[in-house]
Amino acid sequence: MCLSALILVSLAAFTAGAGHPSSPPMVDTVQGKVLGKYISLEGFTQPVAVFLGVPFAKPPLGSLRFAPPQPAEPWSSVKNATSYPPMCFQDPVTGQIVNDLLTNRKEKIPLQFSEDCLYLNIYTPADLTKSDRLPVMVWIHGGGLVLGGASTYDGLVLSTHENVVVVVIQYRLGIWGFFSTGDEHSRGNWGHLDQVAALHWVQDNIAKFGGDPGSVTIFGESAGGESVSVLVLSPLAKNLFQRAISESGVALTAGLVKKNTRPLAEKIAVISGCKNTTSAAMVHCLRQKTEEELLGTTLKLNLFKLDLHGDSRQSHPFVPTVLDGVLLPKMPEEILAEKNFNTVPYIVGINKQEFGWILPTMMNYPPSDVKLDQMTAMSLLKKSSFLLNLPEDAIAVAIEKYLRDKDYTGRNKDQLLELIGDVVFGVPSVIVSRGHRDAGAPTYMYEFQYSPSFSSEMKPDTVVGDHGDEIYSVFGAPILRGGTSEEEINLSKMMMKFWANFARNGNPNGQGLPHWPEYDQKEGYLQIGATTQQAQKLKEKEVAFWTELLAKKQLPTEHTEL
């Protein structure tokens, strides 16, 4: 192993060198040879072969902007796959902040961004000289379909501890990934098509890395969980995976799936200085823009932000998944009702306080010490219509139910955030789980209830199970970073074991683990935290309340969420 590669990995949690083969790992993919590096986790003799920045599609530049991904071009020399690829274009400041908040690494890596970003990272503990066939776990990152990247998530611990091949993929984001004119000129969902292309690449190549293409689990968090859910529903992803895990995000998650995004396309065109007369004119003009110009448009869209002063109906904080007739032939709720989807074993979970701190902070909600009476709450929820998709008269009924204190008593802010968390995450996750169960597929649910020690110091101690908190456990942050309690290390080991057992055989249960009941008509689920135990009927009352309320007060326009 070369000295520079050693320096890269000689961090506190690693030891590089002992027990490594004499030469770095090399794999011959369909497109050409890739050279990786060996890394060992402290205390483990078996090294993991790591390949970073492996291309799975042609760079989506020029005429391939707003077009389906094309297979990567072959190469004749050996491609060096030992450094992190650039992340897909996004707001660089927010992208770096989110990376630093969510990463399981100890070290911080300065991020690079590019439109040329269709790469994946592979972590394999397999002996590449033998024909191992290990389970494959493909991670799809979150970030509201506008932020995030592969290299935030180091697969070393999960791969080492559970003897699985971990693949972390990237996909086009924001305007680049989801711009849709609603017709043949730019159907949209380019980012999801990138995810499908990455899964095809895994089918064609992962056996060379010691992975079993017949045992692929897709898992993701937030918009990554929504992406997993979309792929479960999509005919394009049939037979590309055998199991699925959605953490804090499903295809019914508010704001992330729309029937029609034409108004947003026209707004993007106008901000970019393009005429929005016809679809062809918009697409042609936007393809001429530099990536920096489109980044300027992205920043002007104020993605992920609550606009407290403008017209909320004109607000577009997401560039969402769209009903395109190809990836999504119908709206998610219709596909679920028809039971015509990929009925693979499925874990769906939420965190106890999904709208506890990180999301309201990023979206510019007032800080927790702001006094909140019912009138202020009503105003905030009206401004949140982009996220909640609630008719105005439903908001008043919901406030009556959730905000039980007429005047400010200190609890109203928490109750408002609970309301938003239920609408955006809790209720949709239960409805998707029920639909999956009713289609006859093995389904498991969890609620994560733990406050990791790696959280930002700015997060209030009262927030337990914030959005994204489970990622630290799933990717072994307590082991990789060190300096944490035995309880937190054991929680991480347990969650990795649950996830990997599920990847191995479609059932998370195993020796030495608390029993996780299947989500059947009794609706048993697992509460995961300092104490992990079975419970029943997650969010049952909330689902009943919102289902009944929205049935009575159906929106006259599109109804995309609950």
Curated annotation (Swiss-Prot):
InterPro entries named among the record's database cross-references: AB_hydrolase_fold, CarbesteraseB, Carboxylesterase_B_AS, Carboxylesterase_B_CS, Type-B_Carboxylest/Lipase
UniProt keyword Signal present: yes
GO molecular function terms attached to this record: all-trans-retinyl-palmitate hydrolase, all-trans-retinol forming activity; carboxylesterase activity
Glycan-bearing residues: 80, 276, 490
UniProt record similarity statement: Belongs to the type-B carboxylesterase/lipase family.
Native organism taxonomy: Eukaryota, Metazoa, Chordata, Craniata, Vertebrata
Main location: endoplasmic reticulum
Subcellular location: Endoplasmic reticulum lumen; Microsome membrane
GO cellular component, one term: membrane
Catalytic function, reaction form: a carboxylic ester + H2O = an alcohol + a carboxylate + H(+); all-trans-retinyl hexadecanoate + H2O = all-trans-retinol + hexadecanoate + H(+)
Protein name: Carboxylesterase 1E
Short motif (Prevents secretion from ER): ranges: 559-562
Signal peptide: 1-19
Entry coiled-coil feature ranges: none
The entry's keywords: Disulfide bond, Endoplasmic reticulum, Glycoprotein, Hydrolase, Membrane, Microsome, Serine esterase, Signal
Superkingdom of this protein's organism: Eukaryota
Organism: Mus musculus
